C-alpha cells in the first residue's frame, strides 16, 4: 500500500496533516496479500463532507446508478458481469462460498430491480459510485475509528457492531 499524496499544486494541502493521521498507519495484512497478490486497496479521506439524511442529490445519484445497472445487466444475473465473477473468484480464495458472502457490489446489484434503499447522503453516494464503477466501495466515520485502518483475514470468531437507523443492533 502506498502513502497518500499530501500535496497539490506544488504546496501542502491544508488538511494534509489530518489526512496523514488517518492513513499513515494503514495496513494490508500479509495473509490477504498472499491470497490475492493482485488486490489493491485505495483509501480516501474526505474532510468537511456534510452527512445527513438522503436528499435530492443522493436520490438522483442512486436513480442514475439503478438505471445504469439495469442497462448493464439487461435481465442477466449480476454474476454474468466479469467484475462480479472476479470478486467471486477472490472470495473463493478466502474460502468463502459466494452464495454465503457476496461482495457489497454484488449485493447492491441484486437489489437494483426492487430499488436501492436510501440510507443517508454519504452511503447513498458511495453506493451509487460503487455501481457506476463496478467496484465494492464502503465508508467509515473516521471520527469514531480507533487506530489506523487495516485489512486482515478474518478467523471467524470476530465480534463487530452493526447499526440500523443509528441504533446498535
Feature-to-residue mapping (PLM):
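Charge-biased, low-complexity intrinsically disordered regions
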Residues: 2-169
